[in-house]
Amino acid sequence: MIRLGAFEHLLLLALVRLGDDTYGVPIRDELEARTGRLVSPGAIYTALDRLEQRGLVRSQLGEPTPARGGKRKRCYRLTAKGSAALRDAHGAIAHMTQGIKPKLQTP
């Protein structure tokens, strides 16, 4: 089983939601919108680099565009290994949270 940190888990979930070949800004926007937390670009790119080194995501440079001043953007997608890690993490969380809802109720 591949272990994921909480932020890595959220980042992989954002990649699934956004689909293939997404890049940093939409990933940050998705994370901020769904978690209500501010996320720095540095945190995103550091985590994406780490996930790529582990084979959980793959990146490639897109085509340069006039809107980006001729710069290319790095696009990311989940790998099969990343999907498996996400399924494992989701299963572990589902198993751990099973039956605790009544215990979370305020008296």
Show the residue positions of the predicted features.
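Beta-hairpin "wing" of winged helix-turn-helix
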Residues: 54-69
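Basic amphipathic alpha-helical segments that dock to polyanions
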Residues: 44-51
